[in-house]
Amino acid sequence: MLLNGQISALSLDDNDNGQQHQDEVQAKHQDQGHTCPSRPSVPSLSRIYRCTPVPTIVLDASMVIIEVSNSHVALFGKPRDSLLHTSISDVSPECIPVPNIPILYGALRAACSTREIQVVEHVVVGEKIAHNLRVTPVYEDETLLFVVLEVENLRAEVINNQHAYMNETYKILVDTVKDYAIFMLDPTGHIATWNAGAGVLKGYKAEEIIGKHFSILYSPADRDNGKPARALDVCLREGRIEDEGWRYRRDGSRFWANVLITPIYQFGQHVGFVKVTRDLTERKEAEACMIAAFEESSRLKTDFLANISHEIRTPMNGMQIALTMLTDTGLSEEQREHANIVQDSMSLLLQIVNDVLDYSKLSSGSFSLHADMLDIREIVGAVVRNCRSSLQEGVELDTEISPKLPTRMRGDPLRYRQVLQNLVGNAVKFTEKGSIHVKITSSTDEEDSDSSVVRTEVTDTGIGVPDSAINTLFTPFSRFANSAARKYQGTGLGLSICKSLAELMDGSVGYSPNPNASGSVFWFTAKMGGRSVTPPSKSPSVSGSPVPTEVASEMRSIAPRKHVLLVEDNIVNHTVMLKLLHTIGFQRIDGAWNGAEAVRMVRQKPLSYDIILMDVSMPVLDGLAATEQIRDMGLTMPIIAITGNAMKGDAETYIAQGMDDCICKPVHRDQLLRVLWKWFGT
């Protein structure tokens, strides 16, 4: 009997064997007046089954083999004595034959439960000859006497007749498809069939390729690292595998292929794989062209913006330095007012240039933060001091900083200041009376207890935001305040940049109306680390608060002892930079008009110069090449890049290639003082 999927002895009504039960049944029939025909003795049955031309195994009710035919021994080559008195579950499936023992269990279970013949079809035996296994239960009344397993040889024409329609349909389908290579592999990966599409795509004729391993279609590198074999392993494990990659034709040319491999099973037995390949070379080339076009477009845009930045900043540099020196002279009130107008206009122009560059970097995804230690209180103080001069008469600007705010945190000080400066600057611009209040609070980050979330609110009593503009406040190029009259100048990029920067700092930005008066509340959050970090040994200097008076005084005493080499090709910038350095206190300043001249001067006096201020973009020899040649001399004096290039990564590139610091044009006196103090004062 089959219990829980296992073969066990079948119940014989508590008798020891089928013969005893047979005798009882015969006696019962005689007692009832029936005549029971005599049955052949076991030896007679044994001779019948042993001599039958059909390969046969006879099982008793306990599923133990009690007879094996000569024809079975001849077909399978298994000695009779090795099979007799053996449980059928201990016999190799190939000698029964069945694909596997579970299939045999199923057939025996079905035969014994239904008392009907069961057939396991198309079992491959020997030289790929298909057979059927007939499972016949022999019952007398309710008692199972025997189970007969017979192997039927299926002639080729019978199989062909059974599958003629399917084969013909498949053949027509596969052979007429020329856009796809469709072929079969045997279980070891050797090619078994080859359609017309495969011939067109791969260049092999059927007689040239059938029988060869499919790895011939892969590159030598793929064959060496075992990619074909791994593909079949994954296919068997996961049920299919799809891949894209280079495949090779007979003539050695390659094409970009999409490959799908599926395992083929027959009656639970793995018999091979079907492989479908299509040529995606045109799509791959189109994708490559699109990527190249996108990269070229991005490069051209980057180059254009870099050029625009350089071309605008270079003349602005001369204007800025000349204006700085002009304001140090004895100007009348009217002249000073005119100078302030020029200064304000230059600041606005520079802000527009910076906004366009920042927006370009943010929209392209090429913007990144620079983590460093920062002091929020110091940054807020610097921004407030910077904005006080622009306040309308009577407008108050105050701050409220939570005492729980950590003194030192880790973040990007430049970008935090940029967002804060923008929000406070907007409040100053749009508030004509009343007050502006800056509030800073912090809380522990819920996901990282070592970090803090800093919330910055700027509340004003200005003109407020109309309801129609609320949904587009943080959209690029959106301007709502008196746009027709253009009373308030700007690009409409500021708040959009603030939003992007806040999100880069793992925060957000938002707006709400002032709950206590007319005006607005703009806020942003930023995640700040709490643990200290070691700043890089070299990093580009950034503008900050005004240089203290004592620093300028100290520099004035240090400068006369220092020898400076100024390398600048623009005559205006060269002239005003020389004058600016003189106003700081430097007396020994040499000038070079290009990198080649600078290298020559350094080579003549290698130990003379204490610092080199080097323009980057120059004729004959640019600043980076000149720096490389100076470093090759073994000289380590500070080389400061003075550049109109302000794209993301420019300063880091200059430092990586041997320079020590970077100042972007237009050069402000305080910015130059800060850098010089960094290298001389400490």
Curated annotation (Swiss-Prot):
InterPro entries for this protein? CheY-like_superfamily, HATPase_C_sf, His_kinase_dom, HisK_dim/P_dom, HisK_dim/P_sf, PAC, PAS, PAS-assoc_C
Q: What is its main location?
A: cytoplasm
Q: Where is this region: Disordered?
A: 11-41
Q: How is it modified after translation?
A: Activation probably requires a transfer of a phosphate group between a His in the histidine kinase domain and an Asp of the response regulatory domain.
Top-level division of the source organism's lineage: Eukaryota
Q: Which Pfam families match?
A: HATPase_c, HisKA, PAS_9, Response_reg
Phosphohistidine: modified positions: H310
Tell me the ranges covered by the PAS domain, including all copies: 45-105, 166-239
Question: Locate the PAC domain: which residues?
Answer: 241-292
Question: What is this protein's function per UniProt?
Answer: May be part of a two-component regulatory system required for formation of conidia on certain growth media.
Report what the protein is called: Two-component system protein A
- What species does this protein belong to? Emericella nidulans (strain FGSC A4 / ATCC 38163 / CBS 112.46 / NRRL 194 / M139) (Aspergillus nidulans)
